[in-house]
């Protein structure tokens, strides 16, 4: 029996030795030592270079004191509050959108979920500018015409009713038309000699009715009424109404009223604005001498107005025209407009 085999069976022998294994072991040890030295150098460098910086930071913190800490704390609190508000807003809007589209989300899957959470763009419906309150005019313009439909009862005088209406309302009345019947009419026909009037007895149908009525203190000569009538046998008569115009049944008059009018004298004179200045500069004795020419002009104007309106001579005493030196503000609420 071989002694080597018998001995090997009793105890194991060490592995064979190779030179390459020894070299690898030395290299690993050297690398490990180099790494350990590098780590020590880095720790030493960091320890000696960061320690002064830490000391400086501590000094700055101590110098800043509670002011820096408070500002940092306030910034953090504001940031956290803003984040909370944004999160609450997003969660609220997403919840509303999910509640609106909840029925569609079950079958839509992931792609439909993104569409449900997408907020619509543009201006929401119903957010247009609110309509403004309408402008209501509570007062009529002074130059506006107001239309009137006047019904005059049986047996009433049309001329007297229109004059009373203008006086009580303090508005000028322009008669445009009239329908109905009248009786016992006194008129002056055109082309007849001055002072001649015609009295018509019976019932007549109104074909045309026109005229104007101004409230006092306007001159009475500015008021007048013209009428055209149809008789029972087909004859047509007309002219300026001189006396009363009595209704035979209800009469409907269409008229327009106005509150602003200017009284003018034609033809206009160049020295019209200089006459009041010259009259005001004279003394009391000269006033009588200046009054005679206006009186002559007044008589001429009265005669011309009587011829135009068809008034008989016995009615001229009731007509009083204003003297020419007085302006139109005495007879109407507003003055004559400037030229």
Swiss-Prot record:
A Pfam family of the record is: PCC
Cell compartments where the protein resides: Nucleus
Q: Where in this protein does the record put region Disordered?
A: 1-132, 273-339
- Which positions does the record tag as DNA-binding? 118-130
- Its main localization is nucleus
Which stretches does UniProt call biased (Low complexity)? 24-45, 292-310
Q: Which GO terms describe its cellular component?
A: nucleus
Here the segments flagged for biased composition (Gly residues) are: 102-113, 278-291
Protein task? Transcription factor that specifically binds AT-rich DNA sequences related to the nuclear matrix attachment regions (MARs).
Note on domains (UniProt): The PPC domain mediates interactions between AHL proteins.
Q: What name has this protein been given in UniProt? A: AT-hook motif nuclear-localized protein 26
Q: Which organism does this record belong to? A: Arabidopsis thaliana (Mouse-ear cress)
Organism lineage: Eukaryota, Viridiplantae, Streptophyta, Embryophyta, Tracheophyta
Q: Which gene encodes it?
A: AHL26
